[in-house]
C-alpha cells in the first residue's frame, strides 16, 4: 500500500469537454499546497464546508491558469477523513491537466486508482462494503443498481451483517460460559434457534444475489417460438413502441434483433429471434440454430406460442429459466395450458401478469434491494456452510464453526480481510475516486 498521509491529487470528473471540471487534493499539507496555487482568499483560513471564488495560478510565474471555485473540507469531516480541497474549474482538459501539473510541482503526487476512497476506508469513514457501494454507484446503469448501491453506501447491508455477527459472537460467549460454568449455560434449544434464525437471514441475503448481479451487469431476455407465434408483437408491446417488423407472413424474422429495455430498474437487452421450426432452407436453419444458442446464453427466456393455433412440439430450451407465454389471447383458443401465461399484444390483456412473472423471475421474492458483490457472496456462502456445520454438532463442539461463521460475516465489512483483497477491491476504481 502507498503512504497514507502524503498529499494526493487527481482529476475527479470524466476526461473531455464539459462545463465544470474538478481536481481533488487530499492529505497532510493539502491546505498549504492549495494556498500556494491560489489567488484569492487564503484556503487555510476557510472553515470546513466553505467555498471561495478566485484563480488557480502557477506560483513560479504568477500566471493565472483559470478562474475557479475552491472548496475546503477539514479533517475529519471530509470524504477521506483528511484535509481535502476541491478546485472546480472550467471543464477543459487543458485546464485540468495544468492544475494537476502545478499541484504535483508543489509537492502532491498523482493518486492511484480508488485512493481517495481507500483513505476513507482506512480512516474509518467507510467500511469495505460501503466502499464497494461507492464503485457500484459510479457504475450503476439502471435504477435498481442505483438504489441498491445507495442503500449499501448508507450502511444498510453493513448494519444487517453486523447484527448477525453480534448474535453469533454472543452465542459463542454463552457456549464458552456453558463449558466453563455449566450451571449458567444457555439451553440447547436457544442455541439452535439462534443459529437457525441467523442461517435464515444469510439465506435471505443469498436469495438476492442473482438480482444484485443482474442489476449491476444487466440481463439478456430471449424471445423464442415458432414462426408467426407473435414474438415480434410481444417485443413491441414490452418496449412500448414498434421496434420489430410485424407481418402475418411466417418467417419474417430470419435473424435476431436486439432492443434495450429497462424493467423494474434492471437494464435488459431483449432479443427477438428467428422462428424455430424444422426447415430445409439452409439460411432459415442457420437462424433457428442461432435462436437456440441465444436462448441457451440468455438470463431469461420467453417461450412464445400462438394460442389460436395447434400447440407445436417444444424446442430444446433451458426450461429452468424459461417463462411460457400463450400469445393472441384475444382470439378463440385452440388449446389451454395453465403453465402458459395468456397475453394479447394487440389489446394489452395479460401484459401486467407477464411483467409480474418477469419481476419474480429476475428479482425473486425478496425484491432485489440488496447490493452484493461477488466477494460478498463468497463470504456469505462460507458463513452458510459453517452455520450448517454448527447445527450438525453438539453444542459443546460448535464453537469453532461459530467462530469461523462470524469471521466470514466480518469479511463483508472488511473487519477480517487480507490486505491483497482490499487492494483488489480498490484497483477496480477510477482515478479520482
From Swiss-Prot:
Q: Which residues bind GTP?
A: 228-233, 247-253, 272-275
Which Cys pairs does UniProt list as disulfide-bonded? none
Stored InterPro entries: G_TrmE, GTP-bd, GTP-bd_TrmE_N, GTPase_MnmE, MnmE_dom2, MnmE_helical, P-loop_NTPase, Small_GTP-bd
Provide GO CC annotations from the record.
cytosol
Superkingdom, taxonomy of origin: Bacteria
The EC code for this enzyme is 3.6.-.-
Annotated residues that bind (6S)-5-formyl-5,6,7,8-tetrahydrofolate are located at 24, 86, 125, 433
Q: Which residues form the TrmE-type G domain?
A: 218-363
Query: Which coenzyme or cofactor does it need?
Result: K(+)
Localization: Cytoplasm
Q: Which GO terms describe its molecular function?
A: GTP binding; GTPase activity; metal ion binding
Alphabetized Gene3D superfamilies for the sequence:
P-loop containing nucleotide triphosphate hydrolases, Probable tRNA modification gtpase trme, domain 1, tRNA modification GTPase MnmE domain 2
Cofactor binding description: Binds 1 potassium ion per subunit.
What keywords does the record list, in alphabetical order?
A: Cytoplasm, GTP-binding, Hydrolase, Magnesium, Metal-binding, Nucleotide-binding, Potassium, tRNA processing
List ligand-binding residues for Mg(2+). 232, 253
Main EC class the enzyme belongs to? hydrolase
Q: Name one GO biological process term.
A: tRNA methylation
Instruction: Extract the Pfam families matched here.
Output: MMR_HSR1, MnmE_helical, TrmE_N
Q: Where is K(+) bound in this sequence?
A: 228, 247, 249, 252
Role this protein plays: Exhibits a very high intrinsic GTPase hydrolysis rate. Involved in the addition of a carboxymethylaminomethyl (cmnm) group at the wobble position (U34) of certain tRNAs, forming tRNA-cmnm(5)s(2)U34.
Family per record: Belongs to the TRAFAC class TrmE-Era-EngA-EngB-Septin-like GTPase superfamily. TrmE GTPase family.
Q: How does it assemble?
A: Homodimer. Heterotetramer of two MnmE and two MnmG subunits.
Q: What name has this protein been given in UniProt?
A: tRNA modification GTPase MnmE
Q: Which gene encodes it?
A: mnmE
Amino acid at each position: 500500500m502507498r503512504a497514507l498521509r502524503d498529499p494526493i491529487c487527481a482529476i475527479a470528473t470524466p476526461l473531455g469537454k464539459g462545463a465544470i471540471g474538478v481536481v481533488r487534493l487530499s492529505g497532510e499539507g493539502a491546505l498549504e499546497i492549495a494556498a500556494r496555487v491560489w489567488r484569492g482568499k487564503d484556503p487555510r483560513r476557510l472553515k470546513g464546508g466553505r467555498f471561495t471564488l478566485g484563480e488557480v495560478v502557477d506560483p513560479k510565474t504568477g500566471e493565472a491558469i483559470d478562474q475557479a471555485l475552491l472548496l475546503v473540507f477539514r479533517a475529519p469531516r471530509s470524504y477521506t477523513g483528511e484535509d481535502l480541497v476541491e478546485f472546480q474549474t472550467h471543464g477543459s482538459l487543458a485546464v485540468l491537466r495544468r492544475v494537476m501539473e502545478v499541484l504535483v510541482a508543489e509537492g502532491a503526487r498523482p493518486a492511484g486508482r480508488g485512493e481517495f476512497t481507500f483513505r476513507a476506508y482506512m480512516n474509518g469513514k467507510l467500511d469495505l462494503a460501503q466502499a464497494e457501494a461507492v464503485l457500484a454507484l459510479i457504475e450503476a446503469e439502471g435504477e435498481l443498481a442505483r438504489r441498491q448501491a445507495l442503500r449499501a453506501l448508507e450502511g444498510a447491508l453493513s448494519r444487517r451483517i453486523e447484527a448477525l455477527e453480534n448474535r453469533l459472537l454472543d452465542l459463542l460467549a454463552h457456549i464458552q460460559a456453558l463449558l466453563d460454568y455449566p450451571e449458567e449455560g444457555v439451553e440447547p434449544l436457544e442455541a439452535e434457534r439462534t443459529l437457525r434464525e441467523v442461517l435464515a437471514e444469510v439465506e435471505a441475503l443469498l436469495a438476492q444475489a442473482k438480482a444484485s448481479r443482474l442489476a449491476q451487469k444487466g440481463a439478456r431476455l430471449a424471445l423464442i417460438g415458432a414462426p408467426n407465434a407473435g414474438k415480434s408483437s410481444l417485443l413491441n408491446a414490452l418496449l412500448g413502441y414498434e421496434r420489430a417488423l410485424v407481418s402475418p407472413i411466417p418467417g419474417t424474422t430470419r435473424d435476431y434483433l436486439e432492443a434495450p429495455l429497462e424493467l423494474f430498474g434492471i437494464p435488459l437487452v431483449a432479443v427477438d429471434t428467428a422462428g424455430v421450426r424444422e426447415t430445409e432452407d439452409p439460411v432459415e436453419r442457420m437462424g433457428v440454430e442461432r435462436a437456440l444458442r441465444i436462448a441457451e446464453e440468455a438470463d431469461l427466456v420467453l417461450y412464445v406460442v400462438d394460442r389460436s393455433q395447434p400447440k407445436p412440439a417444444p424446442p430444446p430450451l433451458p426450461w429452468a429459466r424459461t417463462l411460457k407465454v400463450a400469445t393472441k389471447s384475444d382470439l378463440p383458443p385452440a388449446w389451454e395450458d395453465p403453465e402458459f401465461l395468456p397475453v394479447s399484444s394487440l389489446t394489452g390483456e395479460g401484459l401486467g401478469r407477464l411483467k409480474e412473472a418477469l419481476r419474480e423471475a429476475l428479482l425473486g421474492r425478496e425484491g432485489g434491494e440488496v447490493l452484493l458483490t461477488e466477494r460478498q457472496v463468497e463470504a456469505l456462502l462460507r458463513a452458510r456452510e459453517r452455520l450448517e456445520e454448527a447445527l450438525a454438532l453438539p453444542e459443546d463442539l460448535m464453537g469453532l464453526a461459530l467462530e469461523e461463521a462470524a469471521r466470514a460475516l466480518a469479511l463483508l465489512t472488511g473487519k477480517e480481510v487480507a490486505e491483497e483483497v482490499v487492494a483488489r477491491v480498490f484497483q477496480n476504481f477510477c482515478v479520482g475516486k
